[in-house]
A protein has these predicted regions:
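Mid-to-C-terminal alpha-helical segments outside catalytic/metal-binding sites
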Residues: 2-10, 17-70, 99-107, 128-132, ...
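Divalent metal-dependent hydrolysis catalytic cores, especially in the metallo-beta-lactamase
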Residues: 40-52, 58-85, 112-118, 140-144
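A short acidic, glycine-rich active-site loop
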Residues: 45-50, 91-92, 193-200
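Surface-exposed, active-site-proximal loop segments in enzymatic domains
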Residues: 77-90, 124, 187-192
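Portal/gating segments that form or line small-molecule/metal binding sites
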Residues: 91-95, 102
Length: 331
């Protein structure tokens, strides 16, 4: 029987029941405790989402309906954010998440690739957990927020993390865990506007602080297509013309580094995907649905973009993801 290419979804979420219960009322979905959590009555769409994030069989069923062969699964940090906890408690919660993800991968190795979570408030705890995830659990993708306690990931505080990630061959998947500014709670703007802003901020941090210069071998995947950053970088490049001192840590204009990132397709608008492809190339883009709460037909979405020809479709739907994950593209 002839082999065929597989479709890989790089952006799919899970929930660990105990961690989710502990996080209830403490995350961005409740305004960090300012309002009640949304109910999920039996039979509701929200109840189905939670089941798909807690039960691997339910997630696999959803994947198959979408035409997805493998999913890279990460904690839904907007629902079960662990940053509310003390560093030691956060470590305990993140370990529960990582162990659950490793169990899903062990039980269904042909369907899941794992992402591990880290208590980044304390690198003395986070770095050993990263080593455990890689060497004991066999997970090579880190599920990272945009910032920790208001400090973005490019800052010197996190350089030891990037050094260790580089040594361990870790892939970084950056997904903001929600904006704490209460202004964004109205109309759920934390999700529609706040997340793309956070992605632009963390990308700026990584570029300007020289992380991409120092660790070019670390592959960084941006959720939600990198937010606003890829579409407004001209202002950054223009700024360094007037202020060359802002290039203290970089050798090129900021926009040059856009092709150093990978981006998922969780954009919801085919013309935005076309614009992203024009900026960075189809070989830097990975299919990502934000399952189960996001794009319901991620494969069909690719076909709606005018710039996605057969070659680009192959790259985005799975070829590039398999290459950076080190797994076969055909089965």
């Amino acid at each position: 029987m002839a082999k065929k290419p597989i479709v890989v979804d790089f952006h799919s979420h899970i929930l660990e029941p105990y961690v989710q219960k502990m996080a209830a009322g403490r995350t961005v979905t409740s305004g960090f405790g300012a309002q009640a959590e949304m109910p999920r009555p039996p039979g509701s769409r929200r109840e189905q989402w939670f089941r798909q994030m807690m039960e691997p069989e339910a997630q696999i069923e959803g994947m198959s309906k979408m035409g997805v062969d493998m999913s890279v699964i990460s904690s839904s940090t907007v629902i079960q954010w662990t940053g509310w906890a003390s560093p030691q408690t956060q470590l305990d919660l993140d370990r529960r998440i990582n162990d659950m993800i490793a169990d899903w991968v062990r039980r269904f190795p042909d369907r899941f690739v794992g992402c591990f979570s880290l208590p980044l408030k304390d690198l003395h705890l986070a770095l050993p957990e990263m080593e455990r995830a890689v060497k004991q659990l066999g997970i090579r993708v880190a599920n990272l927020p945009a910032s920790v306690e208001g400090v973005y990931l490019g800052e010197p505080r996190f350089r030891p993390f990037w050094e260790a990630a580089n040594e361990l061959g870790v892939i970084a998947f950056i997904h903001p865990d929600g904006v704490q500014d209460p202004w964004f709670q109205k109309y759920s703007l934390w999700n529609s506007v706040g997340q793309p802003i956070e992605e632009a901020k963390v990308m700026s941090s990584l570029i300007y602080e020289g992380i991409l210069e120092s660790f070019p071998g670390v592959k960084i995947v941006m959720a939600h297509g990198g937010g606003y950053m890829p579409h407004y970088h001209g202002r950054l490049d223009r700024n360094v013309t007037n202020r060359p001192d802002t290039m203290a840590n970089i050798k090129h204009p900021p926009g040059w580094y856009l092709k150093s990132f990978y981006y998922d397709t969780c954009l919801y608008d085919p013309t935005t995907l076309d614009a992203l492809i024009a900026k960075v190339g189809a070989d830097r883009i990975l299919l990502g649905s934000d399952f189960p709460v996001g794009e319901t037909d991620p494969v069909g979405f690719l076909r709606k973009a005018k710039s996605v020809d057969d070659r680009a479709f192959a790259q985005i739907s799975g070829e590039t993801a398999c290459a950076i994950l080190g797994i076969p593209h055909e089965r």
